[in-house]
């Protein structure tokens, strides 16, 4: 697949992260590591990783308007479909491949995770928890529970995935869960790796650090 690469042309913008998972992800990334952010949006996470730990970060984003936003901020991005472009990268191209709220938008999540494990030495995934107790109450009331706070008719398709669902998938695919951090209202809780029921019920989201 032909895609357009836009390289860094200016200083990385200095903007405070707006999401709690960004801070957790930044603590998981080693200083100076190479990073590929899948579905990087406006590049806020790339900027944070570059600024906070000197990461050699680049993004992959399908939306051309968001790519332009990244370029305006002096960030290195590749424009193209994530699942197709991932297959084009050589094995072990990056220290980390990151899905920050983008994994649930993948058309083929299993294949996307497999390719990420091939391309990256480690994979970081932050997932919105569809199994949160508030979402369960909404379903009991006959309502569709939004995964990210948006109306169900707005934005790209997002797959309903609980914390336990993702952990099960990762283990089925022979990934090791190095650590997993639950977040509620943007604030991290106690790390978990094996005991999932509490996070599956109470966490708004969780960030997983995986090794293939």
Identify the role of each PLM range.
Residues 88-96:
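A short acidic, Gly/Pro-enriched loop at the edge of an enzyme's catalytic core
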């Amino acid at each position: 697949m032909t895609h357009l690469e836009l390289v860094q042309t200016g200083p990385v913008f200095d903007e405070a992260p707006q999401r709690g998972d960004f801070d957790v992800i930044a603590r998981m990334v080693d200083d100076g590591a190479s990073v590929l952010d899948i579905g990087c949006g406006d590049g806020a996470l790339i900027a944070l990783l570059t600024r906070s730990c000197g990461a050699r970060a680049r993004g992959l984003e399908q939306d051309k308007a968001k790519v332009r936003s990244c370029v305006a901020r002096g960030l290195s991005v590749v424009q193209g479909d994530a699942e197709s472009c991932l297959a084009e990268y050589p094995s072990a191209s990056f220290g980390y491949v990151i899905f920050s709220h983008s994994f649930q938008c993948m058309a083929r999540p299993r294949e996307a995770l497999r390719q990420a494990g091939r391309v990256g030495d480690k994979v970081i995934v932050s997932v919105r928890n569809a199994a949160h107790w508030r979402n369960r109450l909404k379903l009991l009331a006959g309502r569709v529970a939004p995964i990210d706070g948006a109306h169900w008719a707005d934005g790209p398709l997002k797959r309903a995935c609980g914390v336990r669902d993702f952990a099960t998938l990762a283990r089925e695919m022979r990934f090791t869960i190095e650590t997993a951090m639950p977040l509620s209202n943007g604030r991290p809780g106690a790390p978990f790796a094996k005991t999932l029921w509490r996070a599956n019920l109470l966490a708004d989201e969780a960030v997983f650090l995986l090794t293939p």
